[in-house]
Amino acid sequence: MRLRFWLLIWLLLGFISHQPTPVINSLAVYRHRETDFGVGVRDHPGQHGKTPSPQKLDNLIIIIIGFLRRYTFNVLFCTSCLCVSFLKTIFWSRNGHDGSMDVQQRAWRSNRSRQKGLRSICMHTKKRVSSFRGNKIGLKDVITLRRHVETKVRAKIRKRKVTTKINRHDKINGKRKTARKQKMFQRAQELRRRAEDYHKCKIPPSARKPLCNWVRMAAAEHCHSSGLPYWLYLTAETLKNRMGRQPPPPTQQHSITDNSLSLKTPPECLLTPLPPSVDDNIKECPLAPLPPSPLPPSVDDNLKECLFVPLPPSPLPPSVDDNLKECLFVPLPPSPLPPSVDDNLKTPPLATQEAEVEKPPKPKRWRVDEVEQSPKPKRQREAEAQQLPKPKRRRLSKLRTRHCTQAWAIRINP
């Protein structure tokens, strides 16, 4: 209602601004006898102070009209905008909505890869409407789209900032941003592991490792003779299936009778003697020895008889080896060996033999304990030491010859 009231005032002022002179003249000159305005002026001259004078009204209207003439464009623009908004409030847009969040979210979910342009959902038909030629979108839809995009971009930027902060914190400290986030992350990992374990447990044992299961089953059936490692919970299912097909093992009561009786015999008949049957003769026969059955004559009989008779010795033909065997019993004379180069090496010459005889044995090595320690020389004064005669110097050749003769003498006469 307020909008309509102000719109009517603006329209009236615009109409007056376009026709100012006739209105002013009519207000100043034209008087109705029936109106209070005209009567008050003529009939009641004492009431001029209570009512505004025509001159003041004329001056006020002139000021308003002059102000409006100066800002005519602004007034017309505001008037047109108000008219458009008024018309939009009266006539709703074809595909407008009430502005609720669920409608907005449904309105802007669009497949952008297939069609381009703005999209919305009509509240009346509940159909998706695009901005192609022939379809109209209201101003409210455009504003909603812009707000939605801004909110989405804001959330994306905020998420990126938070992620960057968390990643930097992880790189520095190796932990989550806060203790609460760290706890949530650990809880999620634990739930993920539990889900994986539950999925693994749902797989039957025979489907996990068929080859290993078969080997373990074989080891269990053969009383673990193979010595392979096995687990009972893996072989239980397979052994159960195998044992279900086999008959139950014999008990201690019927272990003796089951050897001679069939399994079809009921337990009451085990105490009473059974009637004779065909199987009795068969069981008695293996206990008695069977007579030897004569074999048919064959060609091999003559060969077997001939093998027991010793064959006469057959005379061998004379050969060259007979004379050799007789000669081996007589001892052969020693034959002289031919002279060779090694004879000189084996028989050493006379000088070498004499030198070997003359070689004296090696001197005996004395131990440290057996060797008598020579007394330490007494210290003498310098004067006494100078009085002693100096040792004579000998030539090197004489020392060598003397040393050699002493050594040879020791070797010859040990």
Curated annotation (Swiss-Prot):
| Species assigned in the record | Homo sapiens (Human)
| Protein name in the entry | Nuclear pore complex-interacting protein family member B7
Q: What positions does the record give for glycosylation?
A: 111
Q: Does the keyword Acyltransferase apply?
A: no
* Ranges of compositional bias, category Basic residues: 390-402
Polar residues compositional bias: what residue ranges? 252-262
Question: Per its UniProt record, what InterPro entries does this chain match?
Answer: NPIP, NPIP_N
Q: Where is the composition biased (Basic and acidic residues)?
A: 356-384
Q: Where is this region: Disordered?
A: 242-262, 335-402
Give one Pfam family: NPIP
Q: Which residues form the signal peptide?
A: 1-18
Record-stated family: Belongs to the NPIP family.
Keywords, A to Z? Coiled coil, Glycoprotein, Secreted, Signal
Q: Where does this protein chiefly localize?
A: secreted
The compartments listed are: Secreted
* Record's GO cellular component terms: extracellular region
